[in-house]
């Protein structure tokens, strides 16, 4: 998306000006990928830590299979799965750590469901998970603008002369974890199939980058959805410029409701 941004200045919502009033091709703060390794490590470390130490609990998978994938002995896993007093559960709401041993120090195996999902199930789960995430992140994002402590953490995300794709990742670690955990919750609460999750992730990431692209993309998702449903990059660009309103990531319903009741904070994040 950075390449698209640099090669299509005519799509930019607001072009940063130089000292002599000329258009700036590359906004301040935009860096080459080779200079962003530290940022990548910061972003990935907490996610990798969770991914490599916690057993994955996918829908339609037995607790026994889950525990076996977490390096628990098959017999012990079967006993635990059938013991009503066991502390192990197949729900994601009760995390289970990998049984770390010398031979298996990290969680590298996944217990997968035996059967593939129907296309209808995948479509419904994708729609439901994005709807749930949109509502949850609306509340999370609103809190980042009204609660003093987390407001300070969120402020750097708004410090830029011109919004551009790399702003997507200009986040405090608290915000990063919030993004990922809310996305996981949205998938898990409806017991989505692992294949749905596989499709959800690239769509989720792409839409986040598109929102921060600073571009009026001809193929923007808000142009594909029914009119008024999708917020899109323009709405999010206005949010970054004003600081208030536009808390919903993908759609518009919750923001519209907040505006109707008249409680949408308007101040800019500093």
Give the label of every model feature segment.
Residues 190-252, 257:
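Functionally important transmembrane alpha-helices
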Residues 1-155, 159-187, 248-270:
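Non-catalytic, topology-defining segments of multipass membrane proteins
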